[in-house]
Amino acid sequence: MTAPASKLLQPITVGPLELKNRIMFPPLTTGYEERDGSIGERSLAFYERLARGGVSYIVIGDVAPVMTASPTPKLATDAQIPTFKALADTVHKHGAKVALQLFHPEYDVPGVGRMVMGSMAAAKAAQEAKAAGDEETFAAKMAESNEIRNQAYAKLHHDMQHFVNEASVEQLTQIKEAIAASAARAQQAGIDAIEVHGDRLVGSLCSAILNQRTDEYGGSFENRVRYALEVVAAIKEAAPQLMVEYKLPVIMENPDGTPRGKGGLQPDEACEFAKLLEGAGIDMIQVAQANHTGNMGDTIPPMGAMPYNWTLPVAERVKALVSVPVATVGRVVSVEAGEKILEDGAADIIAYGRSLMCDPDIALKAATGEPIRECLNCNKGCVDAIQNRKYISCVLNAENGDEATIAIKPGEGDKKIAVVGGGIAGLEAARVAAKRGYDVTVYEASDHLGGQIVLAAAPPRKDEIMRSVEYYEKILPGLGVKVELNHAASPADLNAADAAIVAVGAHDVVIPVPGADSEKVVSSWDVLAGKVELTGRAAVIGGGLVGTETAEYLLQHGCQVAIVEMLDKIAAGESETILPLIMSDFAEHNVEQHVKTRLTAITDEGVEAICTTEDGAEEPVKIACDYVVMAVGSKANAFDLDGVTVPVTCVGDCSGERTADIASAIRTAYHAANEL
C-alpha cells in the first residue's frame, strides 16, 4: 500500500462543470461503436466501467459530425441522439462527466462517399447478374466496382495529404456548420462538454508546415488559427450550455532535439494560441502531441521512446499564461507522477489514457493507496489497434472491451488453489482466484517471479515491462496469496489443494542442423538472462520478436549482428509503433538482415543458409560469425501429472494456445481462474 493521493482527488471547476477529481480519460478511438457510428452496448459497458472506477471526466474520441467511412463514433443525424443520451445517462450514474471530441477527417467526405456508394451499387448489380446467369454482365459490373473502389482509395490517400490546401472556403464553412450541428445534438443528448479536436483538419490549418494556403486561412499565424477560432465560436453558439475544451496539438521535440510531428503548432505559437483560445471562451485546454506523421506511435509513444510526462514542459508554459484549467497527457503512468505534477502546479488535470485501460480503478485506488496496475506503454493492444482500425484492448487487462460480459465472479465455497509457475500467467491466475475468495499458493521453481517477462525486459527500451511483475509482487500479499520460491511443485502439493492451475511456461528450441551442437551456439534466452556474454560477430537465427530484441541487446553490448529470418519480414508481430525504433537502431549499427533465408548448417567459420530470391530461385548464403544465437521460438513445457488427483488447468505458454504473447497468457489465466 502507498499513501492515498490528495491532489488528484480534489474537485475542480471547469467552465459550467464541477469535476469530482482531477483524473481524466482522454480521447482514444476504441472501435467499440456500432457500424453506423452510434453508441452500442459494448461502448456503454466500456465507458461505464471507467466511470464506475471513479474517473471524473471522460472524452469520447474522434466523434465525426458527418457520416464518414471512418470507423469512429458519429453524431451526424438526429436519429443517433438517443444512443448518445444513453451514454450520458450511463456515465452520469457514477458521478462522471462526458465529452465528445468532435473532429473532421482530412478528406472530401461527400466525394469519397459517392464513389464508395457507386462501387457498392456496381457490386450489387454484379451479384444480381450472376444470380440471373448473366456471366458477362457480372464480370463487367465487378470490374466497374473494383475500378471505382480503387479510385476512391486513391482519392482518399490524396486528400489525406492535400485536402487542407485544396478545400474551398465553402467546404470549410460546411464542415464548421456540421461540427456545430453535432455539438447541438450533443447538448440535446445530455452530453456535458465538447472537445475540439485541434489536430486533424483543424490542426493542419494551424500548421506552418502543412498549411500552404494563400487565402484568409493561410500564411500568417493569425490566418492559420482563424478557422480553429471560428469552430470554437460556432460550437459555443450552437451549444451554449456545454463546457468547451480544446485539444491543443503541439510539435514537441524528440530526445535528440528534432521536431516530432507536422500538424499543429510549434511550442511558442501554441502558447500564443492558448491565450487566444481563452479569449474566445474556451473553458479548458489539453496540451498534447501533434499528429500527421502516419504513425500513431509519434502521438502516443511506446515505452522507452520518450521520457515520462513528456508533454508536460509545454503544458506548464501554457498554464502560466492562461487562467483556465490545463490538462496534460503523455506517459503519466503512476498516481505518484500525477500527484507530483499537481503539487508542482504544472497542470490542473491529469489525463490517464492507456493507464485507465490497464486499470480503470485508478481513482478508487488513489483514494485507498492500493497498488494500481500500471500501464507498460507497450502499445500492443491499444495503439496498434488504433493504427490498424481494430478494437483496442490492454494486454494486462483481460476484461478490456468485454466489460459487458466479463467480470471476476464470486467464489464457490472455500477452496484451496495451487498455482504452479510464477510467470505472468501464474501470477494473474493467482490474483483472480484470490479475488474470488480462494486460498491460493503459488509454487515457483526458481528464486524469482516473472518467468519470461524478466527476459523480455532485458533489451533496450523494454525495462518498463517489469512493472507487470512488480504489480503482482505488491498486490498478491494483500490478497493473502502465499508465494513459495525455489519450490518445484510435486503431485502432493497439488493434491493438497482442491484444484490446480499449471503455468510452467515454455522453453526455447534449437534448429536441428549440422553443427547445432557446436560450442559457438547459444540460446537467445541465455543471452537475455545474462548467462552468457558475447563479443565480436553474432548471427541471430530467427528475426521474430525475440530475435530482433536479442539483436538489439547484442548491439547494446558491442556486438556486430546479422539476422537470419525465414519469413520475408523482420520483426513480424512487433508493435508498429516500436518497429520504426528497431529499424532505426539496425540501420545505425549496420545490422545485416537476411530475410527469406533458411539456416542449413553451422560451421567453424559461421553459418550457411539458403536464400529464396524474388524470382523463386535458391541461392547459398554464408555469414561469418563468432557466435550463433538461436531465437527460433519456444515449445510448451511439460508438467508431470502422474499421481495428481485434483482438476488441473494449463494456462499461458504451457497451454499450447500461443507462445511468447503476454496478452494470451493473461487472458487464458484470467478465464481459467474465473471458472474454478
Residue map of PLM features:
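Generic beta-strand/beta-sheet core signal
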Residues: 26, 101, 196-199, 247-249, ...
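A generic local structural motif
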Residues: 10-12, 44-45, 271-272, 313-315, ...
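Hydrophobic, well-ordered secondary-structure elements that form the walls
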Residues: 285, 318, 341, 353, ...
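Rossmann-like dinucleotide-binding cores of NAD(P)H-dependent redox enzymes
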Residues: 439-479, 551-599, 655-658
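Rossmann-like dinucleotide/flavin-binding elements
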Residues: 411-445, 484-492, 496, 503-513, ...
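A generic structural signal for alpha->beta connector loops
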Residues: 95, 241, 323, 346-347, ...
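Flavin-dependent oxidoreductase catalytic cores
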Residues: 1-420, 424, 428-435, 439-440, ...
